C-alpha cells in the first residue's frame, strides 16, 4: 500500500502537540517527507517540496542501523537529490502473508541524515587536543599515507596485539559495509592481511546475558519467534520494550501485537518504567527496583515450589541441579536450586514473597498472584530484554529470569520460550569473508580503556583476557569504524576523556564515520564515509519474527563531497600496505556483491537474478516451519539432540561456574555462583553510597534514536525531547516541576537536562534515554543528556560487561 501525504497536511502548520499526536498515529509521516516544521533548529538540506517532475526516480535503499531490524526505504530522487522517502510497498497487509516491512520514524527521516549539516566532507587530521574537535583538511593520499606509515611503525615496535578494532554498530546488516561485529568488517579483513589485531568478545547490548545464559543453555541463548505468541496464553516481559527498541514493521513490536490479537494472551510487563510497549495494551505493569529481578524470580519460585506449580517431570528429564536427584556429585550438599529457594542452602534464608518484596518493591500479595498465574498458565511466553542484564549482577540475573520458563516447562514448545529474548527465522545469505585473525588474544569489549591504561597488567583471571594468560602490550592504535563508543556510548566519559587525551598512550586513533559525532572529535585522522544511500550493498534482517528478508540497498545518489566507501578506503590502504591482491582478490565492490549473491542463490534457490532483485528491492520468505521454537529438537529428543552445555542438559547448577568462582580474582562485592541466586552487586539501592546518592539511575532505548544514531536529526529531537524521567514523589521532595532544568550528578560526572515528572517511573528511580550526544561545557558538565557521564567503568563479574543501568545519583533543581 503506497503511502500518500495529503496536500492538506503539507500545507498545514504543525504544532508540537500535533506532531506528537501524528507520531503516535502515523509513524511521523512528516519525517519521511521534507515537511518544514516550526522548530528552532531544522536540518535544512534542499527544497522540501514533493516533486512532480517526470524524471523522478524511485530507488531502493535501507535503514541499516542497530535497532535489531533492517527496513527498506524507497528514495524518490530528482536531479541527483533525494526529495522524499517512502517505505515498503510490496506484499500485503496480511500478517500471515508476505507483509510489508514499514520503516519507523527513524528510517523515514533518513533524508535528514544524508543532508545533515554535521556530515563529514573530506579527510582531516587533528590539530588541537583530542576531544576539542579541531581539525585541518588534508588529501586522501596524505590520510592514507599517515595511517599506513604509523600503523606499520606501531606493529614493528609493539606487535599486532597493539592494534584494536573498537566496537561500532552504526552500519549494521550489510554484507560489505557492516561495522559489527568488528571481526567481520572490512577493517578486520585489512588487518588480517597485515598480521591481525587485538580482538574483543561480548557487546554493549548483550554481554551479560550472552555469558550468563551460555552456562544455562550452552552458546547463545535462543528464544521463540515473537510470531509464536499466537500460541501463547500468557506473555511476561522482563525489561523488554520492543515498542521503542524494535518498533518498525520488520521488528518485534509488529509481531507481538499481531500475534496477541490471535491468541488474546494476557501481557504482563515488569519494568521500573512504564514503557510504550505497554501504553494501554498491557494487562498489568509491575514496577520493580532496577537490578532486583533475580530476587523477584526467587520469590515467585518459592510460591511455585511450595504450591506444587513446577513441572517436576520436565525438571527431572531435561535439567541439572533443580533438586538432589539431578545435582552433580561435585556439588556441595544442599547445593541445589530448590534448597536455595526454600532456605535449606548455605545462606539459610527462605526466599519468601515477603523477603522478595522488601528487595524489589513489589508487594508480596502481587508476587503470590503472579507466581500462581505463571505456574498455572501454559504455554507462557516468558522473555527478558537486554535491560535487566545491563547491571552489575547482570549475568546471574539473566539465569534467574530464565528459571521461570524452566520451572514451568515452557522451554522447547510452541507458545512458550526459554526465558531469553525472542528469536527469529533467518536466511543463509552469504556475507563478505574477512579471513582469519592470526592474533588469538581478545579482551572484553568494555575493557579497552583499561587496555590503553594498563594493558600489560591485565590478566585472564582478573580481567577476563582470553587466548593467553595476560596482555603483553597496551593498545597503541584504535580503528573506530561507524561507532560512537569511543566516547559517547562507553561508560564513565570523563575517565575515558582523560585516557584518550594523552596521545602518548594510544598513539593513533582513526575514525571512519559520516557525521561529526562525539567520538569523531577524538580522532587523529578522520575519514568521511558514505551513507547507505550513497553506495550499493545488501541489507539483511535480524529480529524479524517468522518472515525473513533481504533488501537490495542500491546506490541512490553519488557520494557527497569527498566521501568514499569503506571498501574503497580499505582497498587503498591495502595497496600502501602491500596486500592489495590478497585484500581485494581483484574485485570491485559491485563485483564482490555479484559474487556473494551468486553464492547466496545456491543456498537460497528462490532468490531472483541479481538484476531482477535490483528492480524488486526486497526478497521475503516465511519460515517453512511456521514459527521458530528455541530448543525444540532438544525437547523432542534430548539424547539425540543434547545442548552444548557440559552435561548436554539445561544447567540450573553449573559446575563450570563453580570452578570459575573458585579460581578467578574478584573485587569485593562481585559474585559468581553456580546457582541463579540473587546478589545485589555493587552500587545497588542497598549500597551504603545510597545515603549520598539516593536515586537509582537507569537507561532506556529512546524512540527518537537508535543508540546515538539519528541523535543529530533535529525533527526527531524536537518530537521526542531528551529529558530525565522522575516520579512525582521524588520530584516534589526536590521542588522539581515538569520541564525544570535539573542537575544529575555523582562522583563520576554531572548532567544538566530538563525533568519529565511522570508517574510512569517507579519512585526512587530516575531514567535517561541512552544515546544522547555528549555536549560538555568548559567544566565538562554535559548539557546533552548523555547518561554515560554518570555510568561506571567497573565491569560486571563474569562477562566483564557494561553495567550501564547500575548507577546511584542525586538530582537537584538548577
Descriptions of predicted regions:
Residues 507-508, 555-574:
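Phosphate/diphosphate-binding loops
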Residues 282-288, 548-559:
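Short beta-alpha connecting loops at secondary-structure transitions
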Residues 2-7, 182-270, 277, 295, ...:
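Extended redox/cofactor-interaction regions of prokaryotic respiratory oxidoreductases
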Residues 566-616, 708-710, 714-725, 729-814:
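Long, contiguous, secondary-structure-rich segments that constitute the structural scaffold
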Residues 2-309, 335, 354, 460, ...:
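N-terminal export/assembly segments and adjacent metallocofactor-ligating motifs
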Amino acid at each position: 500500500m503506497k503511502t500518500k501525504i495529503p496536500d492538506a497536511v503539507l500545507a498545514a502548520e504543525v504544532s508540537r502537540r500535533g506532531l506528537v499526536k501524528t507520531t503516535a498515529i502515523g509513524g511521523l509521516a512528516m519525517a519521511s517527507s521534507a515537511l518544514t516544521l516550526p522548530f528552532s533548529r531544522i536540518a535544512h538540506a534542499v527544497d522540501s517540496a514533493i516533486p512532480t517532475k517526470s524524471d523522478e526516480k524511485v530507488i531502493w535503499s535501507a535503514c541499516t542501523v542497530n535497532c535489531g531490524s533492517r527496513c527498506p526505504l524507497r528514495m524518490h530522487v530528482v536531479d541527483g537529490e533525494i526529495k522524499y522517502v517512502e517505505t515498503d510497498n510490496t506484499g500485503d497487509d496480511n500478517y500471515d502473508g508476505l507483509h510489508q516491512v514499514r520503516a519507523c520514524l527513524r528510517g523515514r527521516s533518513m533524508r535528514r541524515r544524508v543532508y545533515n549539516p554535521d556530515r563529514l566532507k573530506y579527510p582531516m587530521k587533528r590539530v588541537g587536543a583530542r576531544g576539542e574537535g579541531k581539525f585541518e583538511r588534508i588529501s586522501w593520499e596524505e590520510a592514507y599515507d599517515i595511517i599506513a606509515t604509523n600503523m606499520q611503525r606501531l606493529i614493528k615496535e609493539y606487535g599486532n596485539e597493539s592494534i584494536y578494532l573498537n566496537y561500532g554498530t552504526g552500519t549494521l546488516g550489510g554484507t560489505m559495509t557492516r561495522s559489527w561485529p568488528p571481526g567481520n568488517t572490512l577493517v578486520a579483513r585489512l588487518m588480517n592481511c597485515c598480521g591481525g589485531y587485538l580482538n574483543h568478545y561480548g557487546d554493549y547490548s548483550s554481554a551479560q546475558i550472552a555469558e550468563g545464559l551460555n552456562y544455562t543453555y550452552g552458546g547463545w541463548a535462543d528464544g521463540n519467534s515473537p510470531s509464536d505468541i499466537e500460541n501463547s496464553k500468557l506473555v511476561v516481559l522482563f525489561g523488554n520494550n520492543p515498542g521503542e527498541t524494535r518498533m518498525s514493521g520488520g521488528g518485534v513490536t509488529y509481531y507481538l501485537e499481531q500475534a496477541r490479537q490471535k491468541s488474546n494472551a494476557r501481557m504482563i510487563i515488569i519494568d521500573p518504567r512504564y514503557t510504550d510497549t505497554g501504553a494501554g495494551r498491557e494487562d498489568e505493569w509491575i514496577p520493580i527496583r532496577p537490578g532486583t529481578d533475580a530476587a523477584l524470580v526467587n520469590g515467585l519460585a518459592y510460591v511455585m515450589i511450595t504450591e506444587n506449580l513446577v513441572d517436576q517431570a520436565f525438571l527431572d528429564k531435561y535439567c541439572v541441579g533443580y533438586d538432589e536427584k539431578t545435582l552433580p556429585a561435585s556439588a556441595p550438599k544442599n547445593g541445589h536450586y530448590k534448597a536455595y529457594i526454600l532456605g535449606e542452602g548455605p545462606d539459610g534464608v527462605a526466599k519468601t514473597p515477603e523477603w522478595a518484596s522488601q528487595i524489589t518493591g513489589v508487594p508480596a500479595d502481587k508476587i503470590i498472584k503472579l507466581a500462581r498465574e505463571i505456574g498455572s498458565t501454559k504455554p507462557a511466553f516468558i522473555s527478558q530484554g537486554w535491560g535487566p542484564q545491563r547491571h552489575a549482577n547482570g549475568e546471574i540475573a539473566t539465569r534467574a529470569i530464565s528459571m521461570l520458563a524452566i520451572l514451568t516447562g515452557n522451554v522447547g514448545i510452541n507458545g512458550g520460550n526459554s526465558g531469553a529474548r525472542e528469536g527469529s527465522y533467518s536466511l543463509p545469505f552469504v556475507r563478505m569473508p574477512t579471513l582469519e585473525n592470526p592474533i588469538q588474544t581478545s579482551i572484553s569489549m568494555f575493557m579497552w580503556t583499561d587496555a590503553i591504561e594498563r594493558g600489560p597488567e591485565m590478566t585472564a583471571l582478573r580481567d577476563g583476557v582470553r587466548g593467553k594468560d595476560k596482555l603483553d602490550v597496551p593498545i597503541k592504535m584504535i580503528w573506530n569504524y561507524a561507532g560512537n563508543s569511543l566516547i559517547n556510548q562507553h561508560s564513565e566519559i570523563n575517565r575515558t576523556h582523560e585516557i584518550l587525551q594523552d596521545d602518548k598512550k594510544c598513539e593513533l586513533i582513526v575514525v571512519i564515520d559520516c557525521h561529526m559525532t562525539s567520538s569523531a572529535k577524538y580522532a587523529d585522522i578522520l575519514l568521511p564515509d558514505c551513507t547507505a544511500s550513497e553506495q550499493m550493498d545488501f541489507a539483511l534482517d535480524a529480529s524479524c519474527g517468522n518472515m525473513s528478508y533481504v533488501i537490495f540497498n542500491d546506490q541512490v545518489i553519488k557520494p557527497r563531497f569527498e566521501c568514499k566507501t569503506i571498501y574503497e578506503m580499505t582497498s587503498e590502504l591495502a595497496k600502501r600496505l602491500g596486500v592489495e591482491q590478497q585484500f581485494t582478490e581483484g574485485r570491485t565492490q559491485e563485483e564482490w556483491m555479484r559474487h556473494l549473491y551468486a553464492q547466496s542463490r545456491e543456498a537460497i534457490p528462490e532468490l531472483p537474478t541479481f538484476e531482477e532483485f535490483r528492480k524488486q528491492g526486497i526478497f521475503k520468505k516465511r519460515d517453512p516451519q511456521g514459527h521458530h521454537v528455541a530448543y525444540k529438537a532438544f525437547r523432542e529428543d534430548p539424547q539425540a539432540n543434547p545442548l552444548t552445555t557440559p552435561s548436554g542438559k539445561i544447567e540450573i547448577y553449573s559446575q563450570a561456574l563453580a570452578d570459575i568462582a573458585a579460581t578467578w580474582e574478584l573485587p569485593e562485592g562481585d559474585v559468581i555462583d553456580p546457582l541463579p541466586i540473587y546478589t545485589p552487586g555493587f552500587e545497588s539501592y542497598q549500597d551504603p553510597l545510597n545515603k549520598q546518592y539516593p536515586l537509582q539511575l537507569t537507561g532506556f532505548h529512546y524512540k527518537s534514536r537508535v543508540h546515538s544514531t539519528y541523535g543529530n536529526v533535529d525533527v526527531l529531537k524536537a518530537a521526542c525531547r531528551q529529558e530525565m524521567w522522575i516520579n512525582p514523589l521524588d520530584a516534589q521532595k526536590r521542588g522539581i516541576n515538569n520541564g525544570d532544568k535539573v542537575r544529575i550528578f555523582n562522583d563520576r560526572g554531572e548532567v544538566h537536562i530538563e525533568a519529565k515528572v511522570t508517574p510512569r517511573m517507579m519512585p526512587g528511580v530516575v531514567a535517561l534515554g541512552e544515546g544522547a550526544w555528549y555536549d560538555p561545557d568548559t567544566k565538562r558538565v554535559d548539557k546533552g543528556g548523555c547518561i554515560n557521564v554518570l555510568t561506571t567503568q567497573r565491569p560486571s563479574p563474569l562477562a566483564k560487561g557494561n553495567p550501564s543501568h547500575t548507577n546511584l545519583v542525586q538530582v537537584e533543581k538548577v
